[in-house]
Amino acid sequence: MPFIVNTDAERAEMLREIGVENFEALIADIPEEIRLKKALDLFPAMGEPEVKSLLEKMASGNAATCDHVSFLGAGAYDHFIPSAVKTIASRSEFYTAYTPYQAEVSQGTLQAIYEYQSVMCRLYGMDVANASMYDGASALAEAALIALNVTGRNGIVVAGKLHPYTSQVLETYLEAAGDRSIVQNGLENGIGSVEALEALVSSETAAVIVQQPNFYGCLEEVEAIGEIARKNGALFIVSADPVSLGVLEAPGNYGADIAVGEGQSVGNAQSFGGPYLGILTVKQAHVRKIPGRLVGMTKDKDGNDGFILTLQTREQHIRREKATSNICSNQALCALQSVVHLSLLGKEGIRDVANRSMQKAHYLADRIAELPGYSMKFSAPFFREFVVETPVPSATIIEKMLEKKVFAGVDLSAWGEDGLLVAVTEKRTKEELDSFVSELAALG
């Protein structure tokens, strides 16, 4: 869109209106040492064709999943997104991040969020879902705060291998929440040790947290973990991948009090870290403790069904000391894309996506394990992601594979660990999997 600068006369009028003599007086409070003293180093003025050409040239330096075969995972996955998802979400009545405060003119958006909440409750086997969170990490951290508030206890126990970035977000949230503690359970064969967990959970534990599948892609012993939490009066919090729930048991069915997840894998493209989607669901007992907002169904004065924002227990709407969270917005557009995708897939569709991802991941893992020098780091069951021990550094494999237009996976050395984390989605073909194995063999 064109940008037309303000004229000198317009600037003078604005300064006069706010009672400031000149521009220098307007910025008098900004310290001299941080003021810009030189002209900005900008491109010369261009027409639209020139700007488009320049941006395309700059973007061509990116490596993206549209022109690379991707085995990247670790929280963001290359699942297929039907074109209809973007088409529907891009309709003008939906394409906004603005909160639908005016219910009378926002019934379409409110109903879409209501449907999102309903779908997530069915997928996760829970009673209530909020209108969305920033991402999976913030959803888990908010879940921990719910547990602290509900139980009045101070301790959080992480039962298995949580995503390192999620752990950092959790620590940051709890650091600001006062005298709280986080204890990490020991690992055996890539999953949390149930025996060790028994000794860690006590009457001081507010919640036991588990990620399913975990950061390594392995499946944790969630039923045993949940039983330990319940036995000690702690809340059981599960961070579950939504695609995995096409084949794995829903958290609510094995006793989760709160279930959260990262919704990127359903309807939201990988986008250099965001915007993504935080899913947060709870049992009915905790409905008044959830952060953000809910959309509820009601009746108007004529008896017609209508949708409204309800239970907005955030600090913008109620007294600060009574608020459940200071979250100030949500990811409504990302949530919309997610519910559109899941609605297009249906129950059988999400099961098919999960099943094909799982089968292809296991095929690839078996092939890689046959290569000299390569092996699976863990023997625990996994969904669509696994860790490979390699004969050469993972960084070398990733660098060499990029030359072949392949994202080989995630190098775990970034977190002080050995191994290559490989993820497989339904998009990968047998030819791509076999080619990947051949390239690994050549590098070994």
Curated annotation (Swiss-Prot):
Protein biosynthesis among keywords: no
Reactions catalysed: N(6)-[(R)-lipoyl]-L-lysyl-[glycine-cleavage complex H protein] + glycine + H(+) = N(6)-[(R)-S(8)-aminomethyldihydrolipoyl]-L-lysyl-[glycine-cleavage complex H protein] + CO2
Single GO MF descriptor: glycine dehydrogenase (decarboxylating) activity
Keywords associated with the record: Oxidoreductase
Enzyme Commission code(s) on record: 1.4.4.2
CDD domains, alphabetized: GDC-P (cd00613)
InterPro entries: GcvPA, GDC-P_N, GDC_P, PyrdxlP-dep_Trfase, PyrdxlP-dep_Trfase_major, PyrdxlP-dep_Trfase_small
EC class name: oxidoreductase
GO BP terms, alphabetized: glycine decarboxylation via glycine cleavage system; nucleoside metabolic process
Assembly: The glycine cleavage system is composed of four proteins: P, T, L and H. In this organism, the P 'protein' is a heterodimer of two subunits.
NCBIfam families named among the record's database cross-references: PRK00451.1
Family stated for the protein in its record: Belongs to the GcvP family. N-terminal subunit subfamily.
Function: The glycine cleavage system catalyzes the degradation of glycine. The P protein binds the alpha-amino group of glycine through its pyridoxal phosphate cofactor; CO(2) is released and the remaining methylamine moiety is then transferred to the lipoamide cofactor of the H protein.
Name recorded for this polypeptide: Probable glycine dehydrogenase (decarboxylating) subunit 1
Gene that encodes it: gcvPA
